A protein has these predicted regions:
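Membrane-interface micro-motifs in multi-pass membrane enzymes
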Residues: 58, 62, 85-88, 106-149, ...
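Hydrophobic, aromatic-rich transmembrane alpha-helices
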Residues: 92-93, 268-303
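Membrane-interface transmembrane helices that cradle and orient dolichyl/undecaprenyl
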Residues: 141-155, 187-194
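Membrane-interface alpha helices of multi-pass inner-membrane proteins
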Residues: 154-170, 175, 181
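Signature aromatic-anchored transmembrane alpha helix within multi-pass, membrane-resident enzymes
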Residues: 156, 353-384
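Perimembrane helix-loop-helix junctions
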Residues: 175-209
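Membrane-lumen/periplasm interface segments of specific transmembrane helices
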Residues: 201-281
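Membrane-embedded, lumen/periplasm-facing catalytic core of multi-pass transferases
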Residues: 376-418
Length: 418
């Protein structure tokens, strides 16, 4: 048996350099961007009632949230919660790196930077009392995909991870789905037979079904044990009713509309000329590499290629907004839209993977993609801190107003402390 120090030395040698780069870069960049809010205590409307809260949100379907948030205690301690949340997010970056098979250190740092700078994380920090639990849910969602990819029967363990991720917060389900789609597409782009491709796809489908079933079974058992029912909040009770009650066409139309509205006019993904240019560079790089590979492999001769392209164009908005199938009338907060950053991350990863076959042209593409990613990281970091500054000023303004209001009340004739 090894001593603690010997075990640490042994473990350090077993950890890949890519994992170390992903973890450290995510943690350091995350701290640099989000340290102001971690060192502050700025409660919002929910935070005032959550100074101490056991996070038993089983009536919202979040049966594992109380455990996930228990590591930092049930008190709202931004510094402790933020550190634990950053640890989970850094581990998620490691899993993303392994899932996407990234090797280039600068690309890994870019992926980590995008993951920890995207404004959806800043929105999560506004609800800091659940932030550590939510980041654990994100980690488990990504881990479910890695298990399914790595091992032939990994879909079983992946299903367990997905179930517990949804048991913390259901909003990260689209994150796992989009990552699955990317991994499957990469597999399809290699030389594999039809049977292998079908079996590979079924693994991910099996993981998703197993995770959803396990999540629902555990939810029903715990609801029965606690004598509770699902709440109407955010339409979560629609899970038991088989949908929202709206027509299918109306729901689908709303999903497409929301996807386009947030992507093009949400002022989050693109909020100025610099972020627009950076996103355009990433998108054009992917289109160029994909078209080039299409001609190299002569995919254009195969009708299946165009079928896949059409399915992606039709399906990606629906998969991104899959949560709206259950509850189309929910208040779609920014913290529920973390999956949008995957489009940027996956475009950067795709460029890194396939821009290495044509000398100087590909080197130029990799330079452009990396610069675009770092422009976005800086841009999102600035946006996050603008949001934090705005939160603080609004809190101080509200606090000052309440002090003046209380002073006037106390000066009213007949007032007495009861």
């Amino acid at each position: 048996m090894k001593t603690p120090w010997e075990f640490l030395q042994y473990s350090r040698n077993k950890i890949k350099n890519t994992w170390k780069i992903a973890f450290v870069s995510a943690f350091v960049i995350g701290l640099l961007i989000h340290l102001p809010v971690m060192l502050s205590d700025i409660p919002n409307h929910d935070g005032l009632s959550s100074m101490y809260f056991d996070q038993n949100m089983i009536t919202s379907g979040r049966w594992f949230l109380t455990v996930a948030c228990g590591f930092s205690s049930y008190f709202t301690i931004p510094w402790v919660i933020g550190l634990i949340g950053m640890l989970w997010l850094s581990l998620a970056s490691v899993v993303l790196t392994e899932t996407m098979e990234l090797e280039d250190p600068l690309t890994i740092i870019g992926v980590s930077g995008l993951l920890v700078s995207f404004p959806a994380l800043a929105s999560t920090f506004a609800y800091v009392f659940t932030m550590d639990g939510y980041m654990m849910a994100l980690f488990l969602a990504v881990l479910s995909v890695l298990f399914t990819k790595k091992y032939k029967k990994g879909w079983i363990l992946g299903g367990v991870c997905l179930a517990f991720s949804m048991g913390i917060y259901q909003a990260y389900l689209p994150f796992a789905i989009l990552l699955c789609v990317y991994v499957i597409l990469l597999f399809f782009m290699e030389e594999h037979g039809v049977k292998e491709k079908v079996q590979y796809t079924l693994r991910y489908l099996g993981m998703g079904i197993a995770g959803a079933v396990l999540y629902y079974v555990i939810l029903q058992i715990l609801l029965k044990l606690q004598g509770k029912v699902l709440d109407t909040y955010q339409g979560i009770n629609s899970m038991e009713q088989g949908g929202s009650g709206q027509g299918l066409l109306t729901t689908l139309k709303g999903m497409y509309y929301d996807f386009l509205a947030f992507t093009l006019h949400g002022d989050v993904l693109v909020n100025n000329i610099f972020s627009f240019a950076a996103c355009a560079v990433l998108l054009l790089s992917v289109v160029f590499l994909l078209v080039r590979r299409m001609f190299q492999r002569k995919w254009w001769k195969n009708p299946a290629f165009f079928v896949i392209i059409i399915l992606l164009a039709v399906g990606l908005p629906l998969l991104t907004n899959v949560i709206l199938i259950i509850s189309p009338n929910l208040t779609y907060h920014l913290l529920m839209r973390y999956q949008w950053v995957l489009y940027l991350i996956l475009m950067l990863g795709f460029t890194d993977r396939y821009a290495g076959e044509n000398g100087k042209a590909d080197i130029g593409i990799r330079w452009a993609a990396l610069l675009a990613a770092w422009i976005l990281v800086f841009n999102y970091g600035v946006s996050d801190n603008i949001g934090y500054s705005n939160l603080e000023k609004k809190y101080e303004k509200t606090y000052a107003y309440c002090v003046r209001l209380l002073d006037r009340i106390e000066q009213t004739p007949g007032y007495y402390q009861g």
